[in-house]
From Swiss-Prot:
Family recorded in the similarity comment: Belongs to the TMEM234 family.
Phylogenetic placement of the source organism: Eukaryota, Metazoa, Ecdysozoa, Arthropoda, Hexapoda
Keywords of the record: Membrane, Transmembrane, Transmembrane helix
Membrane topology: Multi-pass membrane protein
Annotated protein name in UniProt: Transmembrane protein 234 homolog
One GO CC annotation: membrane
Keyword Transferase set for record: no
Coiled-coil region list: none
Keyword Transmembrane helix appears in the UniProt entry: yes
Length: 140
């Protein structure tokens, strides 16, 4: 049996990296679109709780602006589960979740949402740096 010093480090394959990036993009880039697609949801008012539930469900399922990004987001979850089967859990989870934030911020900015300036960019830089360190730790 090999000792830990004699084991060959597992390299991260391109499939793993691309899958994690795809998941982060599918989750992160759809968040601002889901938010936009649900505009008007909070103004719905009904006389009963059941009536309120019906109004909310009907509102959401009849808006393609909400449903399309939601479906893409959920397909990202399927890609995530498939990625977990092939990659290391301690690499996939933090990288996908942290990069989701980055892609959410980028997409929101591209859609014209106002952001708090340097704090967002500082946070994105730290997230990317942490993701790189996490990936390098798994490769070395």
């Amino acid at each position: 049996m090999d000792s830990p010093e004699n084991t060959v480090p597992a390299s991260v394959d391109i499939y793993a990296v691309l899958s994690i990036l795809l998941v982060a993009i599918m989750w992160g880039a759809t968040n601002p679109f889901i938010k936009r697609g649900s505009i008007g949801y909070n103004e719905l008012k009904a006389d009963s709780k059941l009536g309120q539930l019906w109004l909310e469900v009907r509102f959401l399922i009849t808006r393609w602006q909400y449903l399309l990004p939601l479906v893409i987001n959920q397909l990202g979850s399927i890609v995530y589960v498939l990625t977990l089967q092939r990659t290391e859990l301690s690499l996939t989870v933090p990288m996908a979740n942290s990069l989701t934030f980055v892609f959410t911020a980028i997409t929101a900015r591209l859609l014209g949402e106002r952001q708090s300036g340097w704090k967002i960019y500082c946070g994105m830089t730290l997230v990317i740096l942490g993701t790189v360190i996490c990936g390098l730790d798994k490769m070395l």
